[in-house]
């Protein structure tokens, strides 16, 4: 773009002839990935669509399996997997045709600012309102919904803290003996969820870093492309279809020891969230020139020492971010675990789903707000201790 600017090309020509051809594969890839994410979504359709009888493949799949029609549910899962393969193929087709006009290496120090003039304040206000509506208002809504006895009535006389700190003596007939902060079932589910997140993070983060290292060091080879595609493929599979596969495996004669165990949750979550860590590993390793490691190889430095004393310190924030993302993903995941948990209140997220299914909206709102606060706390503590943060990007 700067070369075109020096040659007096106007902004419209630069965008049409330079910028768009370069970023078009990325735009198409983003569209395909967002389409895949929306297509495989389960939580949003089941919460918002059930009331108006709007069903998707994911919600239909779970309903069929729970009703005893496993065969039909597995067929829907198979169709979802085929669509995921198709999306992956189209994505690889477009991203494999990247164009590049790079003539020299290095980064420019030129900064181009756009003067908004009178539009400065309107645009700023619009962005503030937009951010507040989608980021702050939901938190306020969950907080209010968790302290009212009758939904929709926000008068002070209708508010209570029972759903948070209510004791057994003051409990309503709601299926719980106390508020969520004083209930042992909730704390057990929270501890399992945190333990699951930490175990999955350790497995996925380490595997993602190693996959990124191997793919970057063998960049361009057929094996590298194959490994990178296979590591990314679970992202394109609907979480409900993914859980259905492992449900079928765990209920088979040879693998019944997995059914309803903590181990099967670790296994399915590790594979499902591997794409995020592998992508983070690839991005972080691509930013390190191979000459740095080659210098250590010449001096006979072992591979383990090169990883721990050279590569990891250079990309510490990016690598730790690769460990952080699986933690956050596990802490908010519902669809992946709803078919595999031994009972509805085994994990905090499945407990939330159980509350909403049985009509206990206040408990559901309280648990949702608690999950959000825990995720924010994890991100804040990680940022303070290591400098890595989810809001600063993954693998950047």
Where is each model-derived feature located?
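Membrane-interfacial helix termini and adjacent extracytoplasmic/periplasmic loops
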Residues: 12-13, 45-53, 108-113, 148, ...
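N-terminal, non-cleaved signal-anchor transmembrane helix
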Residues: 76, 80-192, 258-262, 379, ...
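Interhelical loop and adjacent transmembrane-helix boundary motif
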Residues: 38-42, 46-85, 116-120, 149-175, ...
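Loop-to-helix entry region at the N-terminal start of transmembrane alpha-helices
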Residues: 25-26, 35, 184-197, 236-238, ...
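Transmembrane-helix boundary motif in ABC transporter permease subunits
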Residues: 14-19, 92-96, 141, 197-231, ...
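Cytoplasmic-entry segments and transmembrane alpha-helices of multi-pass inner-membrane transporters
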Residues: 1, 15, 25, 109-113, ...
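C-terminal transmembrane helix and the adjacent membrane-cytosol boundary/short C-terminal tail
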Residues: 1, 5, 9-14, 44, ...
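Transmembrane alpha-helices
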Residues: 11-40, 125-139, 233, 271, ...
